[in-house]
Amino acid sequence: MTRDEVNTVLGSLKTDVKRTAKSPQGFDVIAFRAGGNDTDKSFDEKYSTYILIYLKDDIVVGISGNASSMNFDGTVSYGTDAGTLVSNGWVDVDWYKTTAGNAAAYSKDVDNATIIAFADAYGDDKVYSIQIFNNAYSIADMTKCRETTLPMNYSADVLTEMETETFEILNAYLVNTGVRAVDDKALRKNTKVSNVARAYSKEIADEGCIDAANAERKLALSKEALENAGLSFNNWGERIMIGNMDAIGFANSVIESERSRDTLISTDYVFCGIGASVYTESAGKAVYYPNMVIDFVDRVSAL
């Protein structure tokens, strides 16, 4: 499918948040919520769908979907049980697991595409998100944790897009799973809080640490701080910090961290902000780290 064909289809879906941006990997990304401009839809209904379409040379090469209606050629759909995937020949994604070492995503090659289905490992263990890429582009190469010497000085526009997309993906998860016991399942994005998140992201990057409770923590302890926050640094959790990742990778990693997930679904939170920065560990090793302000309650309470 070409870019023009995509735009023709989107024009009939009352989409909002439709925009084109560059991903960190250099793809053109069209992001949208189907029905987002439909005045008959409720707040939650508008946030129940979020789709990212990846293009290279104006040709669609991949798609990430978070929606209760998503389905890929009858092979996998929203709500498919992880056990069913395994029975049908899907394999664990070895670089994407929970802190307990349990599978949180499954992969299968179909025709000329690689599909990754993300399952809610800390919930009902059913599929809530699907990512598909042409085999010419490796999803693992885009998201698997690895050292890199690629420039990570992303523009402010790219960082803003990453923040927005992460927020949208998390909201689609919250609405479709119904894990929040409140009338509105989706969180509201607060500009003031987002500004704090962005500033705090920069502070963390400048201090060379990750821990929200103590921005002065030395780098040698930052890995321990990640693990204490419920993130497995040696497996999927490290993807939160790698520079060569996409928004869906970060959002799903938040979901698969038990502590972050519990914070995310808490009924105490009705809004959130997301910040992003470039964090450099040492010469030749640049990593990308976005963070959610709902994990940093000490900062929010001061507003």
Predicted segments, located by residue:
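Short, well-ordered surface patches within globular domains
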Residues: 157-225, 270-272
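Second-shell loop/turn segments in exported
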Residues: 67-76, 150-161, 178-190, 206-211, ...
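Non-transmembrane alpha-helical segments in soluble domains
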Residues: 7, 86, 171, 198-205, ...
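Intrinsically disordered, low-complexity
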Residues: 117-186, 301-303
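Secretory-pathway/luminal and periplasmic proteins that interact with or process carbohydrate-rich
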Residues: 16, 95, 199-213, 234, ...
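A cross-family detector of function-defining hotspots
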Residues: 2-57, 80-132, 267-283
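A well-ordered secondary-structure block
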Residues: 55-57, 62-114, 220-302
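A short, polar/proline- and glycine-enriched secondary-structure boundary/capping micro-motif
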Residues: 17, 71-76, 139-143
